[in-house]
């Protein structure tokens, strides 16, 4: 997998605000853990399954119509990538993503600055 290409496609998907394009990078059994979940819901900090993630990200895109990410750097590991980027609410973010055998993200952990 070309990690830099993945990173650019991922950023462009988010900046397009096209939910289906965003979700195309993720496995059906995706598990995401991020403190932003509590910002946009009253639930847990982890969501499981593409449908739960679709609902959450759909609401988030509605609440942040001017969402625009700027990629700063990309690092990689074994079947994984970490993206460092400018996120929403003037925060910098690092997302660590782990890929399944099909090259889809199966697990993601997000970290943000204050």
Predicted segments, located by residue:
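Short acidic-aromatic low-complexity motifs
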Residues: 1-29
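Alpha-helical interaction segments
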Residues: 1-5, 15-16, 46-48, 75, ...
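Hydrophobic alpha-helical segments typical of transmembrane helices
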Residues: 6, 18, 56-57, 93
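Hydrophobic pocket/interface hotspot
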Residues: 10, 22-23, 30, 49, ...
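Secondary-structure boundary/capping motif
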Residues: 13, 27, 32, 46, ...
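A solvent-exposed, acidic/Ser-Thr-rich amphipathic alpha-helical stretch
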Residues: 27-72
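A beta-strand edge to alpha-helix "cap/lid" segment located at domain peripheries
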Residues: 58-114
